[in-house]
Amino acid sequence: MSVAQAAEIYDVRAHLFGLAGRLAASRVTLRDVAELGGMVAEMGEAKDIDSYYPLNVAFHARLVELSGNSRVAELYYALGKELHLFRRRGLVGGGAIVLSNQEHLRIVEALRDHNGDLTERTMTDHILAGKTRLLERVKGQGPEVSEPGLRTSKENE
């Protein structure tokens, strides 16, 4: 998959995640919000990508699950699997883990307030910020961006 193809998938995934947030905002309980807050705190203690990334994946999965919409969840997970290596790469360096987790905290706050509009916007923006972090990370890296199954758009030509 090329970086350009991954960027397109990020766009679709962002809006699915936003929809999941809108749906979850009307359904979450105080217990759900506390659980999500605990997950954010645990991610805040992660010292590196190897400890942060699985927690991040679990947090996103829980958010999508809280939407109550199995089709949104199915599509979101499928897109996430396609982007696995890109998502991980986008969280490496430049304070990306800290920024990502600050965005997670804003998502939890919007859910706590049951604000569907804000939750949708915050969750969409979170994925788009991840896309931006990835694109900044791979900019100018050329062939070394490639990992098994990943190619830059120039390599696809």
PLM regions with names:
Residues M1-S26, E65, L135-E157:
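Short linear motifs at protein or domain termini
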Residues V12-L19, R27-R89, S100-A110, L118-A129:
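Conserved amphipathic alpha-helical segments that form helical-bundle/coiled-coil interaction surfaces
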Residues A96-E157:
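C-terminal regulatory/effector modules of DNA-binding transcriptional regulators
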